[in-house]
Amino acid sequence: MYSEKFSAQVRDVIEQARSANEDVQVIVRFQSAASQRSIARLAVGAGAIKVNQDFRLIPATAVTLKPSALDELTDAEDVAEIWLDEVVHILLDVSTPHIRAPQVWEQMHNDGEGVTICVVDTGIDATHPDFAGRVGLTADFSGKGSAADGNGHGTHVASTAAGTGAASGGKYVGVAPGATIMAAKALADNGSGRMSNVMAGLEWAAQNGADVLNLSLGSRGNSDGSDALSSMCNAIVDMGKIMVVAAGNSGPRQSTIGSPGAAEKVITVGASNDQDSVARFSSRGPTADGRVKPDLVAPGSKIVAARASGTSVGQVVDEYYTTASGTSMAAPHVAGLVALMLRADSGLGPMDIKKMLMATSVDINISENEQTEGDKFIMGDGRVDALTAVQYAQSGQQPPPHKPSLPVPSPPSPGPSPPIGCMAAPFRFLKLDRFLPME
């Protein structure tokens, strides 16, 4: 009889491993950090379990074990739960004019300077001109040995959040071009990796100065947000960090929010297109336990952003840029917007930011066959509006709790602008309809 400490998914994988005489990779959550240390030593001594990663923000350890060793773990009173160390994948897909970011740069002289965004992804091409002087700490958790991006997805995501557009003469500028970029390479150059690698990258970023963390990746299927990666994301929000996560590209089917998009405390972002409608590919809610997700949507159709040298993600524009679609591209729009909000008021907490973003979002169109009372499961509270959100952030006031409809209501008069230079160059994104699914 199997223990209630692990799910049917874990049971299925264990049975397959037994039949094939293969090891299994799982994440074990303990009742406390003390029990985590003692049982980890016991596991190593037994020889049937290899410890891959210990986590500090939650009492959990990623291990590789023989199926026969599960009895030892499940019988231990201090073991609370055993999760499968799943493989997660990048989530591949105009734009800032739609969310009114250029007005924030020009009218409020706010480009996100002083705020650090960490992209936990396939790494970054730190030599790209759009990141000159903007890349802070980098680290590798994929086993490659460096954070260099041999895939291109992480570079594109980082550019959307905070690229300067230098290689395009200011044409392709990220939402917060003054922000500092951190990069944690948690996914291999093939675009996939274990949950435990992503969790290690998140933990490193949270403990090394990241203000905003972006995850443009996820697992397949519908999640209830109780898995290992979602638990780590919630713990990081409890530290005071803002977590922005892509919803996934499994729409228009309902109940397609995977992990970590289903995590309760993160900002889960779906995608809109150039018609200001919800993109067909954008994953829909509810979560497996019936909660509303995504929280909101942002542009994610055919976004032009930085291309990592020698890579071919999306449709290549030129030596320095490529076009991609997906909620992967929507999430960094919001991560960049959060940086602008924190620049306006660094005292805002994660829930302040989330509530403000949702309350200032605007209604957009959805397809006729989805015009139901379940609209929140399609677009959350709507498409983000950068100008209104940042104006409220700077004013020190909370927006009204109800969701506004187009046109956007007038925000309060903002206070003094931070004394920084603004990005005066026009911002342009090209938009197409194709998206690259999770594969």
Where are these regions (language model features)?
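Substrate-binding/access-modulating region of protease and related hydrolase catalytic domains
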Residues: 35-37, 68, 164-168, 183-265, ...
